[in-house]
Regions:
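Conserved PLP-anchoring active-site segment centered on the Schiff-base-forming lysine
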Residues: 112-134
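Conserved core segment of the aminotransferase class I/II
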Residues: 225, 229-300, 307-309, 313, ...
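N-terminal small-domain helix-loop-helix segment of the aminotransferase-like
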Residues: 5, 10-101, 108, 284-287, ...
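Generic structural signal for small/hydrophobic residues in well-ordered secondary structure
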Residues: 24, 28, 36, 53, ...
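Conserved glycine-rich beta-strand-loop-beta hairpin in the small C-terminal domain of fold type I
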Residues: 282, 298-307, 317-330
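PLP-dependent enzyme catalytic core of the Aspartate aminotransferase-like
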Residues: 161-162, 344-353, 358-394
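Active-site phosphate-binding strand-loop segment of PLP-dependent enzymes
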Residues: 142, 146-215
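Helix C-cap/helix->beta junction micro-motif
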Residues: 31, 137, 198-199, 313, ...
Length: 394
């Protein structure tokens, strides 16, 4: 604007530009490349759940503002899911809150629980909205880096303990972990739980990939560990489990006090969202366990296809224990800069990926790592692998 010298964007958000996902998806569209960057499936979820959404629309359920905490049918289904899967009992009226996807749940939790100047310990690399939401809350993020070890990315518990200070308010967890695919073990989570109780910390845990774990990995909600239910906000989502990312239906489960606090922030964000889809997700959560087992087996096969193809193309591959992302090391290809590599990859191979460095405060830690998504059709993954194998011949 003419004559204005003060920056329009406030200083809390000044470090955040357009997300890398928007940039790389636009690059995929412009070049006609296969988009293995952003984590969304290229097929829809179960037909019966789509039909449930259609019925809700036609019957006028959710077409007007739904209740602020979410429709009772969905809150009840979420509580039933937590009890059936993990033995966690939540009151659907006081301890469950429906949100506009997990991203709003993260934002509302941090805005509600973090005071300006509070420190938030987060595992890096991290989903990019974590940093922005901490900044919007006026908090200070304190990253603890997951580092490559024995083919995976490992948490150093001593480093985590050292990161906690008198100013620490909460630990922000993500397991299964995006982008590395690490699934925190029961022993690791027990150590984190002991630290949280010893230092009187809250835990906000993003568990949207809870059903996407492979081989012998086990997803353990930290809220299920002794002494943790009363200090944990657990975040879940329908998008990843049921392949309806556009519906934006997420939720939190927590004590009445924590749920009320998060709702106080959430009501001034979207207030409500996704009315008809809430009824459909309630039905999805009641699908037989055979659905999630089938999804897990399907994704594990896709993980193996992409991982083996990337290894054959010359990448160093960190095979994930969970999520639907593979992190690769580009140094065996003679590359060291993930940003430059990913920006050139569409022209070189017709494939789009994400540079992991965007998920780090310590950018140098993530510089040689690149993330690929395998939540695509098998034929798409095979074509991507065939294209990537040409890299060594270009």
């Amino acid at each position: 604007m003419a004559g204005m010298t003060r920056p329009l964007l406030n200083r809390r958000l000044a470090e955040f530009g357009t997300t890398i996902f928007a940039e790389m998806s636009a690059l995929a569209a412009r070049t006609g490349s296969i988009n293995l960057g952003q984590g969304f499936p290229d097929t829809d979820g179960p037909e019966e759940i789509r039909e449930a959404a259609v019925r809700a629309l036609r019957e006028g359920r959710g077409n007007q503002y739904p209740p602020g905490p979410g429709v009772p049918e969905l809150r009840t289904a979420i509580a039933e899911h937590q009890l059936r899967r993990y033995g966690l009992a939540y009151d659907p009226d006081a301890e469950v809150l429906v949100t506009a996807g997990a991203t709003e749940a993260i934002a509302a939790a941090l805005l509600a629980l973090v005071e300006p100047g509070d420190e938030v310990v987060a595992l890096e690399p991290y989903y990019d909205s974590y940093a922005a939401c901490i900044a919007m809350a006026g908090g200070t993020r304190v990253p603890v880096t997951l580092r490559p070890h024995a083919g995976a990315f490992a948490l150093d518990l001593d480093e985590l303990k050292a990161a906690v200070t008198e100013r620490t308010r909460l630990i922000l967890l993500n397991t299964p972990h995006n982008p590395t695919g690490t699934v925190l073990s029961r022993a690791e989570l027990t150590a984190i739980a002991e630290l949280a109780q010893e230092r009187d910390l809250l835990v906000v845990t993003d568990e949207v990939y809870e059903h996407l774990v492979f081989d012998d990995a086990e997803h353990v909600p930290i809220a299920s560990l002794p002494g943790m239910r009363e200090r944990t906000v657990t975040i879940g989502s329908a998008g990843k489990t049921y392949s309806f990312t556009g519906w934006k239906v997420g939720w939190i489960t927590a004590t009445p006090e924590l749920t009320s606090a998060v709702r106080s922030a959430k009501q001034f964000l979207t207030y409500v969202a996704s009315g008809p889809f809430q009824y459909a997700v309630a039905e999805a959560l009641r699908l037989p366990d055979a659905y999630t087992e089938g999804l897990r087996a399907e994704l594990q096969a896709k993980r193996d296809l992409l991982s083996e193809g990337l290894a054959a193309a010359g990448f160093g591959v960190h095979r994930p224990a969970g999520t639907y992302f593979v992190t690769t090391d580009i140094r065996p290809l003679g590359e060291t800069d993930g940003f430059a590599f990913c920006r050139a990859l569409p022209e070189r191979a017709g494939v789009v990926a994400i540079p992991n460095a965007v998920f780090y405060d310590h950018r140098e830690e993530g510089a040689p790592f690149v993330r690929f998504a395998f939540c695509k059709r098998v034929d798409v993954l095979q074509e991507a692998v065939d294209r990537l194998k040409r890299l060594g011949r270009v």
